[in-house]
Amino acid sequence: MGMLTAFGGLGASVRRITAGGAGRGERESMYVVFVAGTLALTVFISYTTFATAMLMRRWRLTSNPLLSKADAVVRLMLIGVCIGLGAISGLDYRTLGWTWENAWQQLLLGGAIGLGLGLGLHVLSQWVRNSMGTRLYSKTFSEMIIPRTQREFYFIAAALIPVVILEELLFRSLLIGGFSPLLPAWLLVILTSLVFGALHLPQGAWGIVGASIAGAIFGLLFLFEHSVLAPMVAHYVANLLQIMLVFRLLDGPHSSKPGAETGVRRLEAGSNAAEE
């Protein structure tokens, strides 16, 4: 009965969304396809993230996953899927956040929030390490994404762009904007931030907490600006700043992987001493 009621409520909401005008039945069908496709995409990405986290417990990657050409191609394809889902939803572009009104304002606001968030997460990382003797991000994950050279840092900065675009299109544009006719905006922000945090499972428990907080901030920024541009900029700046800070804490570029691993061990020396 509960499932039947849920589907009945979905049907009523879809009818409200597509009320009036010719082709109403077709619009209803396409919105249902949009909802199903978006949920399927979320489940797919969730499953692959969970599988990656399990794999990392048994097998150590020898290269930076952000620089994988195969992964980059998949991300670009998924970005196309997100755009396609938004296009068939029947919703106006403002609802999806696909607007560029006051673009400079959004760029500046997103950059400022991203800078503040990145610094805040860095402070949280230091507090977690000093007070609890653990790390905000798992050691394995940190060692994988840390640039080995200055040149690699620039490649990672470029590789982050499609990562951020994909995550913001899915979690803010589709799951908040696209589902806003079905559920209250505040509830969507909470739900998406929790899922967004869970998808950062490879980063460890505290990494999930940090990502959930960031997801909530990006969601609120999306609602405030009615655009996905500002949260995209904030997301990118925050991620890049965190990588930059870790890179500099490791005494700058390293020509080999063992050098970077030595740097990570040096960062952990204080917390290990505290445990002893």
What is the meaning of each model-derived region?
Residues 61-66, 90-163, 181, 251-259, ...:
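Juxtamembrane helix-loop-helix connectors linking adjacent transmembrane helices
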Residues 75-79, 157, 165-172, 214:
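Core segments of transmembrane alpha-helices
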Residues 81, 85, 89, 117-128, ...:
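Alpha-helical membrane-inserting segments
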Residues 130-145, 166-191, 220-227:
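Membrane-interface helix/loop boundary segments of multi-pass membrane proteins
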Residues 165-170, 174-175, 202, 237, ...:
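Active-site His/Glu-centered metal-binding helix of metallohydrolases
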Residues 189-198, 204-263:
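Functionally important transmembrane alpha-helices
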